[in-house]
């Protein structure tokens, strides 16, 4: 779920073989991000605490990203840009990830995955309120469709608790603020350096939380497998896959294809966790994804880390 990319920074589309390679990379990325909720549910079943899980996720992924950046000769952010990215990681991404993973304790994986995808609509509204950007009638209807879809999705859910729904919506709101906060700094520093600093900053915060509360590390092969899958497959590989796909497809197509994420979450939740999906949830999810696709293709800004 964390990419650190400004969608507007790349708009070049490719054709032929390179384009299909881009589609494959985005499919890998979406599968990784979409599967994260499933791995988190498994880790909870193995008595891994939320703070320990997120500390391991961020420290493993952050160190591997840093090593990859060193091999590529990555230029590290400095000065005010570095401080801004540290704040984005230590405050924004810590808050968003806490809400998302905490929501999974009280709500179905499929519902939490769909609620996160409210962020393009929220970003559109916040951009209009904070920066006086014109929404326009069509994008306004897309925002309304996303909200209506959310109402249907929540109303059709038979198992989630109100706290889980509230945490899911709060996570989407924090993520939207995080997006707007990074809108200007990310084009200057680049996606990979930004994602690395954000990850390591979040790791430092969760490391402090683990030290204060005491670790609750995985005590089984299943627990460690789930945590490592979150850090490597659902974070590191998902980020790299998105960057490769963005390079080959451009921002608009990459963002549109990334709407596979909640579909992956819902499908895996059904197959692996035995979660049920009602007709109202399917209808609501379809409305949310339709709104997201429209916003992605018509000027919605997004920064994914």
Residue ranges and their predicted role:
Residues 1-52, 56, 157-184, 305:
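Glycine-/small-residue-enriched transmembrane alpha-helix faces in small-molecule transporters
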Residues 32-39, 66-110, 115-116, 152, ...:
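Specific transmembrane alpha-helical segments of multi-pass solute transporters/efflux pumps
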Residues 65, 86, 126, 135-155, ...:
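Hydrophobic transmembrane alpha-helices of multi-pass small-molecule transport proteins
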Residues 43, 53, 57, 103, ...:
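Hydrophobic/aromatic residues within transmembrane alpha-helices
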Residues 2, 21, 40, 45-95, ...:
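Transmembrane alpha-helices of multi-pass small-molecule transport proteins
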Residues 26, 30, 56, 97, ...:
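Helix-helix packing/entry segments at the starts of transmembrane helices
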Residues 38-50, 102-105, 151-163, 210-227, ...:
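Membrane-interface helix termini and inter-helical loops of multi-pass transporters
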Residues 52-63, 91, 97-132, 170-171, ...:
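Specific alpha-helical transmembrane segments that line the substrate/conduction pathway
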């Amino acid at each position: 779920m964390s990419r650190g990319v400004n969608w507007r920074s790349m708009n070049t589309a490719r054709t032929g073989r390179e384009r299909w390679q881009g589609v494959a990379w985005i499919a890998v990325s979406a599968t990784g991000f979409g599967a994260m909720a499933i791995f988190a549910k498994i880790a909870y079943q193995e008595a891994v605490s939320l703070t320990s899980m997120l500390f391991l996720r961020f420290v493993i992924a952050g160190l591997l990203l840093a090593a990859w950046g060193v091999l590529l000769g990555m230029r590290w952010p400095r000065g005010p840009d570095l401080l801004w990215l540290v704040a984005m990681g230590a405050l924004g991404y810590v808050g968003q990830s806490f809400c998302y993973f905490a929501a999974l304790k009280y709500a179905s994986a499929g519902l939490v995955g769909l609620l996160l995808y409210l962020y393009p609509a929220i970003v559109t509204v916040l951009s209009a309120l904070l920066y006086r950007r014109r929404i326009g009638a069509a994008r306004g209807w897309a925002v309304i469709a996303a909200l209506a879809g959310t109402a249907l999705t929540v109303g059709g859910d038979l198992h989630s608790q109100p706290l889980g729904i509230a945490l899911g919506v709060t996570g989407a709101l924090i993520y939207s603020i995080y997006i707007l906060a990074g809108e200007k700094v990310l084009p200057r520093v680049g996606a990979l350096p930004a994602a690395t600093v954000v990850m390591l900053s979040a790791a430092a915060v969760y490391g402090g939380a683990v030290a204060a509360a005491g670790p609750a590390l995985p005590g089984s092969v299943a627990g460690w497998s789930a945590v490592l899958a979150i850090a490597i497959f659902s974070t590191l590989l998902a980020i790299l896959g998105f960057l490769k796909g963005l390079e080959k497809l451009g921002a608009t197509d990459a963002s549109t294809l990334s709407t596979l994420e909640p579909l992956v979450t819902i499908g895996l939740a059904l197959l692996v966790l035995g979660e049920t999906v009602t007709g109202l949830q399917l209808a609501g999810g379809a409305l949310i994804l339709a709104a997201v696709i429209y916003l992605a293709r018509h000027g919605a800004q997004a920064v994914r880390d």
